[in-house]
Design a protein with these regions (language model features):
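A cross-taxonomic marker for long C-terminal extensions/tails that follow the last structured domain
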Residues: 121-141
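Short glycine/proline- and charge-enriched loop/turn segments
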Residues: 104-113
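Short, flexible active-site recognition loops that position polar ligands and cofactors
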Residues: 112-122
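Conserved AdoMet/S-adenosylmethionine-binding subsite of the radical SAM
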Residues: 1-98, 104
Length: 141
């Protein structure tokens, strides 16, 4: 989940799940709003509530070069996740261009044509930083 919903919706399903995969895209609220159309306040509030109700929560981070892979964002993200006691794992989901042809097939414009996937070096740098902060890190979905 991206976590952007009323808390009541979470409470309806959390009693049935042990594991939640929770996406965090950007920790700066204004930048999150620019990228997604909504700020991240509700998302962060829900993350803090969800983690108290489940056995395990894994944070998933789509890594999109020049949009959310900055050192500042990664540092803020790890600082926030460090407050979520049950989170031990962060999954990095590097941007790829595998869906470009699908956009063409349905007559839609692909808006990220100018963005290339992150380099292995960049991914490994981010992975090492997060591991050094005490988290298990997996790359890919």
């Amino acid at each position: 989940t991206c976590g952007y919903c009323k808390w009541e919706y979470f409470t309806e399903v959390l009693e049935y799940v042990d594991l939640v995969l929770y996406d965090l895209k950007h920790l700066d609220s204004a930048e999150h709003k620019r990228l997604t159309g909504v700020d991240n306040q509700l998302i962060l509030e829900n993350a803090a509530k969800v983690v108290k109700k489940v056995k395990e929560m894994i944070i998933r981070v789509p890594l999109i070069p020049s949009l959310n892979d900055s050192k500042d964002n990664i540092m803020m993200l790890v600082d926030f996740v460090s407050t979520l006691e049950k989170v031990k794992e962060i999954d990095l989901l590097p941007y790829h261009q595998l869906g470009v042809s699908k956009y063409n097939q349905i007559g839609q414009t692909y808006k990220l044509n100018e963005i290339n996937p992150p380099s292995k070096e960049k991914i490994n740098d981010i992975k090492r930083y997060i591991e050094n902060r005490g988290f298990l890190v997996k790359v890919g979905g």
